[in-house]
Amino acid sequence: MEEEDESRGKTEESGEDRGDGPPDRDPALSPSAFILRAIQQAVGSSLQGDLPNDKDGSRCCGLQWRRCCRSPRSEPRSQESGGADMATVLDTAADSFLVELVSILDPPDTWVPSHLDLQPGESEDVLELVAEVRIGDRDPMPLPVPSLLPRLRAWRTGKTVSPQSHASRPACSRHLLTLGTGDGGPAPPPAPSSASSSPSPSPSSSSPSPPPPPPPPPPPALPAPRFDIYDPFHPTDEAYSPPPAPEQKYDPFEPTGSNPSSSAGTPSPEEEEEEEEEEEEEGLSQSISRISETLAGIYDDNSLSQDFPGDDSPHREPPPPQTLGAPGTPPQADSTRAEGAPRRRVFVVGPEAEACLEGKVSVEVVTTAGGPALPLPPLPPTDPEIEEGEIVQPEEEPRVAVSLFRAARPRQPPASVATLASVAAPAAPPASAPRAPEGDDFLSLHADSDGEGALQVDLGEPPAPPAADARWGGLDLRRKILTQRRERYRQRSASPGPPPARKKARRERQRSGDPAPPDSPTWEAKKHRSRERKLGSHSTARRRSRSRSRRRSRSRSADRRRGSHRSRSREKRRRRRRSASPPPAASSSSSSRRERHRGKRREGGKKKKKRSRSRAEKRSGDLEKLPAPVPPSGSDRDSRRRGAVPPSIQDLTDHDLFAIKRTITVGRPDKTEPRAPSPAPAVSPKREVLYDSEGLSADERGAKGDKDRRRSGAASSSSSSREKASRRKALDGDRGRDRDRSSKKTRPPKDSAPGSGALPKAPPSSGSSSSSSSCSSRKVKLQSKVAVLIREGVSSTTPAKDSSSSGLGSIGVKFSRDRESRSPFLKPDERAPAEGVKVAPGSTKPKKTKAKAKAGAKKAKGTKGKTKPSKTRKKVRSGGSSTASGGPGSLKKSKADSCSQAASAKGTEETSWSGEERTTKAPSTPPPKVAPPPPALTPDSQTVDSSCKTPEVSFLPEEASEDTGVRVGAEEEEEEEEEEEEEEEQQPATTTATSTAAAAPSTAPSAGSTAGDSGAEDGPAARASQLPTLPPPMPWNLPAGVDCTTSGVLALTALLFKMEEANLASRAKAQELIQATNQILSHRKPPSTLGVTPAPVPTSLGLPPGPSSYLLPGSLPIGGCGSTPPTPTGLVPASDKREGSSSSEGRGDTDKYLKKLHTQERAVEEVKLAIKPYYQKKDITKEEYKDILRKAVHKICHSKSGEINPVKVSNLVRAYVQRYRYFRKHGRKPGDPPGPPRPPKEPGPPDKGGPGLPLPPL
């Protein structure tokens, strides 16, 4: 049934020959139409998908045909057009359809021309179709390859030709896929899209394919845009992918089945087709879910005839599902990666799979040119999603697969391929068998999934099971594949260098933006490998390519920002993580990964694998972190519910996972990039776990994850891109923050994973864990963005109060904007890694840079914790490792991250023991900030640290070593307070900060002790030093105050507005948090009364920090806490803090200090509430709003009565507003005129009573 196995040739052939080819089909009808009709008959629900396949198959650039036709679809040549490929037809119509197909297939002699007309550059590597159609038990009918090949030529030549792509939208999709995948390069390796073999999958494949830079705009406009946007900003894929995300209706069991198509469905016509198919596939999804259930282990079968099971039982009607587009996928993969597409794809759809599938369609596509004849895995035409997302990560797979697959390429003998194809045909678990025979191809599905090349590994091993593949039960196959994958991953792990390097290079290239062209060529090579891999895992490959494309887009944008440093660090992290926790490492999404990881290490593992692959390219670093850890389930689910934050793996159901994947698609590219080298090993286990736990082949899950990612690609992709951008550059402050938010949402699971995984991983490699955690934390931090922060903060504020750990995890409301706003003020070092930026947000208060760094660490922790309270707690409680995890969460806050890791892990540790010393060190904290050496930091962390390193290292050695630790504790507390104040000002942020701070300090002791105080001292000192380096010039108070004022104020103000809504809830939580903080600080600070108290007192300054940030402009750190002058003085902070302590009356007077802090926080909230109406009415400008807030808070805090009377506050604010309005009218600056008015207002200070009297001390 060479059916379209030359799917490329088929494209045209499909469309044109179909006219001829489908004599049975009623040539009168356009091949697509006829096939559609036939498919409708055969597969009611699959029909739509089939139709797209039809269109794709016949016109669809060889893409779909590659996917569909190559696979059993090609058998239904006539149907192929219809998209109800032979496989599907065989499945559904079995004999009758088979006969029809055979008759049609026979005519298709023209369909598969012996030689393809390939566009220059499209080596014949497309496919040499050796197809054999076996209907039922009948003898295989060799289809004339020539007929298919001509079509391929047409497709190839007209690859961009709309005729086929226009012939039918699916055709376009396929074309797109082909173009996108093949040319688009790695991303489209929608070979996984092959999964798209079913129409829906095809689109999915198509979706991923567009991401590749295949320029062939001709196919559809969609592809072109994808190429254009995708190429430049692989986010396009995401953009496309997100629409499909909603389509993630694929069953939980079939993560890849529906999602791939849905995620990829939207991206391009193919994606649209996928969507159509998805509609069909809804039935298919159900059937697929049954299939996945039935063929849980027969992922390969699912891939080949994912729908097949559905077809047989649920989808018998939809032959396309059975077709699974394995052939179609190959075409897509091939056409997509025509240059480097797998040359050989043998898809056998036959009774083996199911009795119902009497027809056995064996299509072997042997590509002549392009070196690697990557056998595209037979992808389920209808249920390509399972196959697609299965394990193949479109982006990763192509890259990782390249090297492996090149070697594997040769492996695809027509016979074996055919066997595999035949295995695929059976809807039953046996269907998967063909993949093993396909060996690399089919395993490639699994290997493809390897974000880091893990999938590649799968390629090699699966060949062993080929014979049994079809017979493997869903579970057996899964296990077998998993085992093989593990071995492969291990092998890869042992020698991940070449593929990962290549992948990395490609990813980096892509990230660099140079990717599109280089990626195309590289991808071609890789595509070949990928395709070989994808032969077995075409839909996975397609998905991966999609994910990869997205990742590339994200990676490219992010990587461009981050540069190779980030990629490398990520890769390292990934490698570490994969090495440390290979199973989780492959987690589809970092967020999903993390969260899922916890709950479903297996399930999560697979998904995480996918995610991590998807993200690996996107955020390999983050993903790296996420994969190893097993995220707690509670957090995951909450995250998922939130939507912003992906749920924990353990809590996630397949649907949840799908949703998460959609959301998490963002992070996936990251993982792929750095993880490429070591991910393979890690992925294998993860995949394995997913495979086993979910009963879906790991590939399926991966595909699903990919698809989810793709679906959430648009949103996630942008998020991912943003995340990457953030990670990469502080420059992309907003973007980074958005990304961070997105990432955080995506990453929280990762963070969780690092929390769980980091701890486990910490033992293996504390640094690695830190690094991973750092990434996770950073993600969490991202997640802790204002939106997420408020959400998380409000809900988790209470938990934070409940326990320091809770506190840590309770409020993740640290506004990412802090970093953004502060980024200008942050030292280049801090910002340099773009993680530094995160540091700033982490330690929103520049007031105490060190505190900030610590705060960053803490907040990273806290944020992380807040984002996933339980996870953070677990992490923190876990000890230094968890702290490190928290720290890593702040990876983006390079410094904060360092501090988070060293200071958070160690700083936290130090907090308990060195809190006392901290006070002493407080004055020199800013200098210690330099301490860039994070002893325990992993290369990533160190990289971040190095970026954060400042010349103040000298301070770090002296005080940083000894005092930094103390400071970390004291500073943390101070920061807690400061952050509380500031965040209180920011409302939810304040609560979060306080919660985080409180939890961090409290956790610090436990985590700190766990991690080891001595180590903590060193690391924290260094990190603390580093952190202070940010605002080294400013003393703690000043840095916090000044930074807050300069960069923090803006961020705070902006956040204040954003968080104002969360103000009330925040307030309640803040109060609780304050109480908790008081308790924590009382407990903690009493032990280090003198040492810590000064820090708290400075925190007093910290108190002012919130206001101070606003007052800072007035250069009066609202040191209303006892040090007004210090704000300007950079060194005053020590004395300032001391003063603050004094004013707080007692370094041991933590309660008083806390009281002041809380008062300030409450004042901030009250003032905000009072100002809000004016601001909303635009009676005052933002600047005025900030000034009034600062002044009013200062006044209120310094009022004699010290009480916060809402009425008085309102009056004070009104007076300020009036004054400012008056001055504005008269062209005077409130600063000048307020001078006189201020005195009047000063009386107000006693009780902030009087109409707002702006205190002169601003």
Swiss-Prot record:
Residues 256-266, 940-949 have a biased composition (Polar residues). Keywords: Isopeptide bond, mRNA processing, mRNA splicing, Nucleus, Phosphoprotein, Repeat, RNA-binding, Ubl conjugation. Residues 193-207, 414-426, 752-777, 795-806, 987-1019 have a biased composition (Low complexity). Residues 269-283, 384-395, 971-986 have a biased composition (Acidic residues). GO terms for cellular component: nucleus. The modification Phosphoserine is found at residues 241, 444, 449, 493, 495, 512, 520, 579, 581, 678, 684, 693, 697, 821, 823, 878, 885, 912, 914, 941. Residues 1-32, 159-345, 370-398, 410-1034, 1114-1154, 1223-1258 are annotated as: Disordered. The keyword Repeat applies. There is a cross-link at residue 814 (Glycyl lysine isopeptide (Lys-Gly) (interchain with G-Cter in SUMO2)). Residues 480-491, 540-555, 562-579, 594-613, 845-877 have a biased composition (Basic residues). Residues 208-223, 374-383, 924-937, 1246-1258 have a biased composition (Pro residues). Pfam families: SCAF11-like_C (PF23030). Its main location: nucleus. The modification Phosphotyrosine is found at residue 691. It comes from the Eukaryota. May function in pre-mRNA splicing. Belongs to the splicing factor SR family. This is Splicing factor, arginine/serine-rich 19. It comes from Rattus norvegicus. The gene is Scaf1.
